[in-house]
Amino acid sequence: MKKILSIILITACLACGCSSASGTGKNTSKSTASEPESIDFFAMDTTIKFSAYGDKKVLKGAKKVLTDLEKKVSVTDSGSEIYHINQNGSGTLTGDVSDLMQKALQMCTQTDGALDISIYPIVKAWGFTTGDYQVPDESTIQSLLPMVDYTKVEFDKTTGNVTIPSGMTIDLGSIAKGYAGQQSAQYLRDNGVKSALLNLGGNVQTIGSKPDGSPWKVGIKDPNGDTPMMVLSITDQAVITSGEYERYFEQDGHTYWHIMDPATGHPADSGLCSVTIVGDDGGTCDALSTSLFVMGLEKAADFWGKSNDFEAVFVTDSGEVYITEGLKDKFALTDDHADTTVKVISR
Protein backbone atom coordinates (compact mmCIF):
# COMPACT_ATOMS: atom_id res chain seq x y z
CA MET A 1 0.00 0.00 0.00
CA LYS A 2 1.10 3.57 -0.58
CA LYS A 3 2.49 5.52 2.35
CA ILE A 4 -0.21 6.49 4.83
CA LEU A 5 0.12 9.49 7.10
CA SER A 6 -2.27 9.82 10.04
CA ILE A 7 -3.71 13.20 10.91
CA ILE A 8 -6.42 14.21 13.35
CA LEU A 9 -8.72 17.09 12.57
CA ILE A 10 -10.44 18.52 15.64
CA THR A 11 -12.22 21.39 13.91
CA ALA A 12 -15.02 21.19 11.46
CA CYS A 13 -16.86 23.39 9.01
CA LEU A 14 -20.35 22.08 8.38
CA ALA A 15 -21.43 23.80 5.20
CA CYS A 16 -24.29 21.72 3.87
CA GLY A 17 -26.07 18.39 3.80
CA CYS A 18 -24.76 15.25 2.20
CA SER A 19 -24.14 15.62 -1.51
CA SER A 20 -25.72 19.04 -1.68
CA ALA A 21 -24.51 22.58 -2.01
CA SER A 22 -25.60 26.17 -1.78
CA GLY A 23 -24.20 29.46 -2.87
CA THR A 24 -25.02 33.10 -3.52
CA GLY A 25 -23.56 35.87 -5.60
CA LYS A 26 -24.09 39.54 -6.38
CA ASN A 27 -23.83 39.44 -10.16
CA THR A 28 -27.30 39.68 -11.68
CA SER A 29 -26.50 38.45 -15.18
CA LYS A 30 -28.34 35.35 -16.34
CA SER A 31 -25.33 33.07 -15.87
CA THR A 32 -24.57 34.39 -12.36
CA ALA A 33 -27.94 35.44 -10.96
CA SER A 34 -28.12 36.09 -7.21
CA GLU A 35 -30.30 33.02 -6.66
CA PRO A 36 -30.01 29.75 -8.56
CA GLU A 37 -32.75 28.30 -10.69
CA SER A 38 -33.52 24.65 -9.99
CA ILE A 39 -35.57 21.72 -11.22
CA ASP A 40 -36.37 18.43 -9.50
CA PHE A 41 -37.29 15.21 -11.28
CA PHE A 42 -37.04 11.44 -11.06
CA ALA A 43 -34.84 9.53 -13.49
CA MET A 44 -32.26 6.75 -13.48
CA ASP A 45 -34.02 5.23 -10.48
CA THR A 46 -33.30 8.22 -8.24
CA THR A 47 -34.43 11.73 -7.35
CA ILE A 48 -32.43 14.36 -9.20
CA LYS A 49 -31.98 18.08 -8.57
CA PHE A 50 -30.30 20.45 -11.01
CA SER A 51 -29.42 23.89 -9.64
CA ALA A 52 -27.75 26.53 -11.80
CA TYR A 53 -27.15 30.24 -12.00
CA GLY A 54 -28.81 30.74 -15.36
CA ASP A 55 -32.01 30.44 -17.35
CA LYS A 56 -34.42 27.74 -16.20
CA LYS A 57 -35.07 26.81 -19.83
CA VAL A 58 -31.44 25.74 -20.07
CA LEU A 59 -31.92 23.50 -17.04
CA LYS A 60 -34.83 21.83 -18.79
CA GLY A 61 -32.56 21.22 -21.76
CA ALA A 62 -29.99 19.59 -19.47
CA LYS A 63 -32.73 17.39 -18.04
CA LYS A 64 -33.64 16.28 -21.56
CA VAL A 65 -30.01 15.33 -22.22
CA LEU A 66 -30.12 13.02 -19.20
CA THR A 67 -33.55 11.50 -19.82
CA ASP A 68 -32.80 10.91 -23.50
CA LEU A 69 -29.66 9.02 -22.54
CA GLU A 70 -31.55 7.00 -19.95
CA LYS A 71 -34.02 5.84 -22.62
CA LYS A 72 -31.15 4.65 -24.80
CA VAL A 73 -29.22 2.70 -22.14
CA SER A 74 -32.01 1.20 -20.02
CA VAL A 75 -31.78 -2.56 -19.54
CA THR A 76 -35.56 -2.88 -19.17
CA ASP A 77 -36.95 -0.32 -21.66
CA SER A 78 -37.82 -2.24 -24.83
CA GLY A 79 -36.97 0.83 -26.91
CA SER A 80 -33.41 1.19 -25.67
CA GLU A 81 -30.31 0.33 -27.67
CA ILE A 82 -28.91 -1.78 -24.82
CA TYR A 83 -32.18 -3.72 -24.49
CA HIS A 84 -32.06 -4.47 -28.22
CA ILE A 85 -28.55 -5.88 -27.96
CA ASN A 86 -29.43 -8.02 -24.95
CA GLN A 87 -32.47 -9.44 -26.73
CA ASN A 88 -30.82 -10.05 -30.09
CA GLY A 89 -27.18 -10.65 -29.25
CA SER A 90 -26.04 -7.80 -31.45
CA GLY A 91 -26.87 -4.29 -32.53
CA THR A 92 -25.50 -0.87 -33.32
CA LEU A 93 -24.98 1.85 -30.75
CA THR A 94 -25.28 5.48 -31.76
CA GLY A 95 -23.69 8.72 -30.63
CA ASP A 96 -23.32 9.11 -26.89
CA VAL A 97 -24.31 5.48 -26.20
CA SER A 98 -21.43 4.28 -28.36
CA ASP A 99 -19.14 6.69 -26.53
CA LEU A 100 -20.43 5.39 -23.20
CA MET A 101 -19.82 1.78 -24.22
CA GLN A 102 -16.27 2.58 -25.25
CA LYS A 103 -15.67 4.32 -21.92
CA ALA A 104 -17.22 1.47 -19.94
CA LEU A 105 -15.10 -1.20 -21.61
CA GLN A 106 -11.98 0.91 -21.08
CA MET A 107 -12.77 1.09 -17.37
CA CYS A 108 -13.39 -2.66 -17.21
CA THR A 109 -9.93 -3.19 -18.67
CA GLN A 110 -8.20 -0.58 -16.51
CA THR A 111 -9.67 -2.07 -13.34
CA ASP A 112 -8.81 -5.62 -14.42
CA GLY A 113 -12.44 -6.69 -14.26
CA ALA A 114 -13.31 -5.21 -10.87
CA LEU A 115 -15.85 -3.37 -13.01
CA ASP A 116 -17.70 -5.65 -15.40
CA ILE A 117 -20.64 -4.50 -17.54
CA SER A 118 -21.86 -8.11 -17.86
CA ILE A 119 -22.59 -8.53 -14.12
CA TYR A 120 -26.34 -7.87 -14.56
CA PRO A 121 -27.56 -11.53 -14.33
CA ILE A 122 -25.80 -11.86 -10.97
CA VAL A 123 -27.33 -8.65 -9.65
CA LYS A 124 -30.73 -9.85 -10.88
CA ALA A 125 -30.32 -13.24 -9.17
CA TRP A 126 -29.89 -11.45 -5.84
CA GLY A 127 -33.07 -9.44 -6.49
CA PHE A 128 -31.46 -6.02 -6.66
CA THR A 129 -33.01 -5.24 -10.05
CA THR A 130 -36.59 -5.90 -8.89
CA GLY A 131 -36.57 -5.47 -5.11
CA ASP A 132 -37.45 -9.15 -4.63
CA TYR A 133 -34.34 -9.77 -2.55
CA GLN A 134 -33.03 -13.27 -2.01
CA VAL A 135 -29.80 -15.17 -1.45
CA PRO A 136 -29.47 -17.36 -4.55
CA ASP A 137 -28.24 -20.92 -4.38
CA GLU A 138 -24.53 -21.26 -4.99
CA SER A 139 -25.33 -23.51 -7.95
CA THR A 140 -27.30 -20.64 -9.50
CA ILE A 141 -24.39 -18.25 -9.03
CA GLN A 142 -21.90 -20.70 -10.50
CA SER A 143 -24.12 -21.27 -13.53
CA LEU A 144 -24.21 -17.52 -14.21
CA LEU A 145 -20.55 -16.66 -13.64
CA PRO A 146 -19.26 -17.99 -17.00
CA MET A 147 -21.23 -15.23 -18.73
CA VAL A 148 -19.76 -12.53 -16.50
CA ASP A 149 -16.82 -11.62 -18.70
CA TYR A 150 -16.57 -8.21 -20.35
CA THR A 151 -13.76 -9.47 -22.61
CA LYS A 152 -16.36 -11.46 -24.57
CA VAL A 153 -18.14 -8.26 -25.62
CA GLU A 154 -17.20 -7.44 -29.21
CA PHE A 155 -17.39 -3.71 -29.87
CA ASP A 156 -16.32 -1.73 -32.93
CA LYS A 157 -15.90 1.87 -31.81
CA THR A 158 -15.88 3.09 -35.42
CA THR A 159 -19.23 1.61 -36.43
CA GLY A 160 -20.81 1.20 -32.97
CA ASN A 161 -21.53 -2.45 -33.69
CA VAL A 162 -21.79 -4.69 -30.61
CA THR A 163 -22.01 -8.47 -30.38
CA ILE A 164 -22.38 -10.48 -27.16
CA PRO A 165 -22.45 -14.25 -26.57
CA SER A 166 -25.72 -16.09 -26.07
CA GLY A 167 -26.77 -15.85 -22.43
CA MET A 168 -24.90 -12.63 -21.69
CA THR A 169 -26.63 -9.43 -20.57
CA ILE A 170 -24.81 -6.10 -20.54
CA ASP A 171 -25.67 -3.14 -18.35
CA LEU A 172 -23.96 0.26 -18.35
CA GLY A 173 -25.54 1.29 -15.04
CA SER A 174 -22.23 1.31 -13.18
CA ILE A 175 -21.05 4.26 -15.26
CA ALA A 176 -24.19 5.73 -16.86
CA LYS A 177 -25.29 8.04 -14.07
CA GLY A 178 -21.89 9.71 -13.77
CA TYR A 179 -21.64 9.97 -17.55
CA ALA A 180 -25.15 11.44 -17.77
CA GLY A 181 -24.30 14.06 -15.16
CA GLN A 182 -21.19 14.95 -17.10
CA GLN A 183 -23.12 15.27 -20.38
CA SER A 184 -25.81 17.39 -18.74
CA ALA A 185 -23.14 19.63 -17.26
CA GLN A 186 -21.50 20.04 -20.65
CA TYR A 187 -24.85 21.06 -22.14
CA LEU A 188 -25.15 23.75 -19.48
CA ARG A 189 -21.61 24.98 -20.14
CA ASP A 190 -22.30 25.11 -23.87
CA ASN A 191 -25.32 27.30 -23.10
CA GLY A 192 -23.44 29.82 -21.01
CA VAL A 193 -23.84 28.44 -17.49
CA LYS A 194 -20.70 28.99 -15.43
CA SER A 195 -21.94 27.99 -11.99
CA ALA A 196 -24.12 24.96 -11.22
CA LEU A 197 -24.53 21.88 -9.09
CA LEU A 198 -26.21 18.73 -10.38
CA ASN A 199 -27.21 16.17 -7.76
CA LEU A 200 -28.10 12.80 -9.24
CA GLY A 201 -29.20 10.98 -6.12
CA GLY A 202 -25.92 11.64 -4.34
CA ASN A 203 -23.78 11.62 -7.49
CA VAL A 204 -22.72 15.24 -7.69
CA GLN A 205 -21.42 17.14 -10.71
CA THR A 206 -20.34 20.75 -10.27
CA ILE A 207 -19.76 23.46 -12.84
CA GLY A 208 -17.22 26.07 -11.86
CA SER A 209 -17.48 27.54 -8.39
CA LYS A 210 -20.18 29.51 -6.64
CA PRO A 211 -20.76 32.96 -8.15
CA ASP A 212 -18.75 34.56 -5.33
CA GLY A 213 -15.74 32.47 -6.33
CA SER A 214 -15.86 30.11 -3.37
CA PRO A 215 -15.91 26.34 -3.92
CA TRP A 216 -19.02 24.21 -3.69
CA LYS A 217 -19.42 22.33 -0.40
CA VAL A 218 -20.30 18.67 -0.93
CA GLY A 219 -21.08 16.48 2.05
CA ILE A 220 -19.81 12.89 2.29
CA LYS A 221 -22.26 10.68 4.16
CA ASP A 222 -21.37 8.73 7.26
CA PRO A 223 -21.98 5.13 6.09
CA ASN A 224 -23.22 4.26 9.57
CA GLY A 225 -25.48 7.28 10.05
CA ASP A 226 -27.79 9.72 8.32
CA THR A 227 -25.62 12.83 8.36
CA PRO A 228 -22.42 13.92 6.58
CA MET A 229 -19.15 12.96 8.22
CA MET A 230 -17.11 15.45 6.19
CA VAL A 231 -17.50 18.25 3.68
CA LEU A 232 -15.36 18.58 0.56
CA SER A 233 -14.58 21.89 -1.14
CA ILE A 234 -15.07 21.24 -4.84
CA THR A 235 -14.71 23.34 -8.00
CA ASP A 236 -15.73 22.12 -11.47
CA GLN A 237 -15.48 18.42 -10.61
CA ALA A 238 -17.63 15.37 -9.95
CA VAL A 239 -18.03 13.72 -6.54
CA ILE A 240 -19.46 10.21 -6.71
CA THR A 241 -19.91 7.67 -3.91
CA SER A 242 -20.63 3.96 -3.82
CA GLY A 243 -21.60 2.50 -0.47
CA GLU A 244 -22.98 -0.73 0.89
CA TYR A 245 -25.64 1.30 2.71
CA GLU A 246 -27.23 2.53 -0.54
CA ARG A 247 -29.13 -0.66 -1.32
CA TYR A 248 -29.10 -3.78 0.81
CA PHE A 249 -31.20 -6.41 2.53
CA GLU A 250 -30.84 -8.59 5.60
CA GLN A 251 -31.49 -12.31 5.83
CA ASP A 252 -30.75 -14.74 8.66
CA GLY A 253 -28.66 -12.16 10.48
CA HIS A 254 -26.49 -11.31 7.47
CA THR A 255 -26.45 -8.11 5.42
CA TYR A 256 -26.13 -8.29 1.64
CA TRP A 257 -25.48 -5.21 -0.49
CA HIS A 258 -25.84 -4.46 -4.17
CA ILE A 259 -22.19 -3.99 -5.11
CA MET A 260 -21.21 -7.35 -6.57
CA ASP A 261 -17.76 -8.86 -6.99
CA PRO A 262 -17.60 -10.14 -10.60
CA ALA A 263 -15.10 -12.81 -9.54
CA THR A 264 -17.38 -14.45 -6.96
CA GLY A 265 -20.95 -13.47 -7.82
CA HIS A 266 -21.43 -12.36 -4.21
CA PRO A 267 -21.60 -8.90 -2.62
CA ALA A 268 -18.08 -7.46 -2.57
CA ASP A 269 -16.60 -8.28 0.82
CA SER A 270 -13.56 -6.04 0.49
CA GLY A 271 -13.38 -4.47 3.93
CA LEU A 272 -14.73 -1.18 2.59
CA CYS A 273 -18.19 0.19 3.24
CA SER A 274 -17.93 3.41 1.24
CA VAL A 275 -15.80 4.81 -1.59
CA THR A 276 -16.02 8.39 -2.86
CA ILE A 277 -14.22 9.47 -6.03
CA VAL A 278 -13.46 13.08 -6.97
CA GLY A 279 -12.37 13.92 -10.50
CA ASP A 280 -12.97 15.85 -13.69
CA ASP A 281 -14.75 13.05 -15.55
CA GLY A 282 -18.09 11.97 -14.09
CA GLY A 283 -18.19 8.68 -15.95
CA THR A 284 -14.74 7.73 -14.73
CA CYS A 285 -15.64 8.68 -11.16
CA ASP A 286 -18.79 6.56 -11.29
CA ALA A 287 -16.94 3.53 -12.61
CA LEU A 288 -14.12 3.89 -10.09
CA SER A 289 -16.39 4.30 -7.08
CA THR A 290 -17.73 0.81 -7.78
CA SER A 291 -14.55 -0.91 -8.91
CA LEU A 292 -12.35 0.42 -6.11
CA PHE A 293 -14.98 -0.70 -3.61
CA VAL A 294 -14.63 -4.20 -5.06
CA MET A 295 -10.82 -4.04 -4.95
CA GLY A 296 -10.55 -3.16 -1.26
CA LEU A 297 -8.34 -0.54 0.37
CA GLU A 298 -4.87 -1.84 -0.45
CA LYS A 299 -5.46 -2.53 -4.14
CA ALA A 300 -7.52 0.67 -4.48
CA ALA A 301 -4.71 2.73 -2.95
CA ASP A 302 -2.19 1.15 -5.32
CA PHE A 303 -4.51 1.84 -8.27
CA TRP A 304 -4.77 5.49 -7.21
CA GLY A 305 -1.00 5.70 -6.82
CA LYS A 306 -0.55 4.74 -10.46
CA SER A 307 -3.18 7.23 -11.66
CA ASN A 308 -3.26 11.00 -11.86
CA ASP A 309 -6.86 11.82 -12.70
CA PHE A 310 -8.82 11.34 -9.46
CA GLU A 311 -8.78 11.54 -5.67
CA ALA A 312 -10.66 9.34 -3.21
CA VAL A 313 -12.17 8.92 0.24
CA PHE A 314 -12.32 5.39 1.66
CA VAL A 315 -14.28 4.29 4.73
CA THR A 316 -13.61 0.79 6.05
CA ASP A 317 -16.00 -1.62 7.73
CA SER A 318 -14.27 -0.85 11.03
CA GLY A 319 -14.90 2.89 10.62
CA GLU A 320 -11.42 3.98 9.57
CA VAL A 321 -11.33 6.92 7.15
CA TYR A 322 -8.67 7.37 4.47
CA ILE A 323 -8.27 10.18 1.95
CA THR A 324 -5.78 10.56 -0.88
CA GLU A 325 -3.32 13.40 -0.57
CA GLY A 326 -4.97 15.62 -3.18
CA LEU A 327 -7.90 16.12 -0.81
CA LYS A 328 -5.99 16.76 2.41
CA ASP A 329 -6.51 20.52 2.16
CA LYS A 330 -10.03 20.31 0.72
CA PHE A 331 -12.03 18.66 3.48
CA ALA A 332 -13.41 19.44 6.91
CA LEU A 333 -15.00 17.06 9.36
CA THR A 334 -18.49 17.86 10.56
CA ASP A 335 -19.16 18.65 14.22
CA ASP A 336 -20.47 15.15 14.96
CA HIS A 337 -17.26 13.62 13.59
CA ALA A 338 -14.72 16.18 14.79
CA ASP A 339 -12.69 13.56 16.68
CA THR A 340 -12.40 11.19 13.73
CA THR A 341 -8.88 10.21 12.73
CA VAL A 342 -8.35 10.67 9.00
CA LYS A 343 -5.41 8.90 7.40
CA VAL A 344 -3.87 10.41 4.29
CA ILE A 345 -2.67 8.10 1.51
CA SER A 346 0.31 9.59 -0.30
CA ARG A 347 2.26 8.59 -3.38
State where each predicted segment sits.
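Mature catalytic core of soluble alpha/beta enzymes
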Residues: 2-11, 15-347
